[in-house]
A protein has these predicted regions:
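N-terminal FAD cofactor-binding segment of flavoenzymes
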Residues: 64-109
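Residues forming anionic-ligand binding surfaces in small-molecule and nucleic-acid pockets
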Residues: 221-235
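Glycine-rich FAD pyrophosphate-binding loop
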Residues: 43-68
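Short beta-strand to alpha-helix junction loop
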Residues: 86, 182-191, 234-240
Length: 240
């Protein structure tokens, strides 16, 4: 008998009342990536957890399916920040999966944008990104270098900005003060507003925001914080 393919593999058991072994410390409804992550973290804290799912298998957007001999993913296409084990994203994945989830690096040219007749490759590594953009947009070297220089300060400012927003008011005050002192002045502006301070070339702006779908808002409406975090996330390429 052949082994099941990823698209036919079933994870979990059918719900039956007589199979329950309660009481449970936590009941999680839905076995998508978020539900499974919460379940794994609670379980690691010694909690007794049950995950309930109406589909025949757990996994949500981690599912895949077959059509005409080809296998397709339903959700996650590729993600970044998996190449080095010290990154926060990699440490989180290793924690919730006990380091069992293995990652494969995609090609250095991991994606491609088409803007009119122009083809722009999304490449791995800051130097490669700069070289690709400068070859496509001669005369825009300073704007491209400034844009890449903006990405790191945003990432460094985010812990303070986040804590200032989620902590109770009394505890948040020092973090708000720190955020005002340390955060770059462009942090609370839209993506388009920031990019138009660097260049008036609309095709370059389109290239820099080509992955706007990952944050769900067009550059006119999206926060530059989110844009910069996503751009930095993929700065060293994609992983699967």
């Amino acid at each position: 008998m052949s082994s099941p393919t990823p698209s036919t593999l079933r994870v979990g058991r059918r719900y039956r009342a007589n199979r329950l072994d309660g009481p449970y410390d936590a009941i999680i409804i839905g076995s998508g990536i978020g539900g499974l992550t919460a379940a794994a973290c609670l379980s690691k804290m010694g909690k007794k957890v049950i995950v309930l799912e109406q589909h025949y298998t757990a996994g949500g957007f981690t599912h895949s399916y077959d059509r005409n001999g080809y296998e397709w993913d339903v959700g996650v296409h590729y993600i970044g920040d998996m190449g080095a084990k010290h990154t926060l994203a990699r440490r989180l994945f290793d924690y919730v999966t006990d380091s069992k989830l293995q990652w494969a690096a995609m090609d250095d040219h991991y994606d491609r944008l088409f803007i009119g007749n122009r083809q722009i490759d999304l490449v791995a590594g800051p130097e490669a990104v700069a070289n690709e953009l400068k070859s496509q947009f001669p005369g825009e070297d300073q704007a491209i270098d400034s844009y890449l220089d903006y990405l790191s300060p945003v990432a460094k400012a985010m812990p303070g900005v986040t804590l200032a927003k989620i902590l109770p008011n009394l505890l948040a005050r020092p973090f708000r003060h720190l955020a005002r002192r340390k955060a770059p002045d462009f942090l609370n502006r839209t993506t388009r507003e920031v990019l138009e301070t660097l260049t008036g070339n609309q095709e370059l702006i389109a290239a820099l925001t080509g992955q706007w779908g990952d944050n769900g808002l067009v550059p006119d409406d999206s926060s530059f914080i989110i844009h910069a975090l996503i751009a930095r996330h993929y700065l060293y390429g994609g992983y699967y």
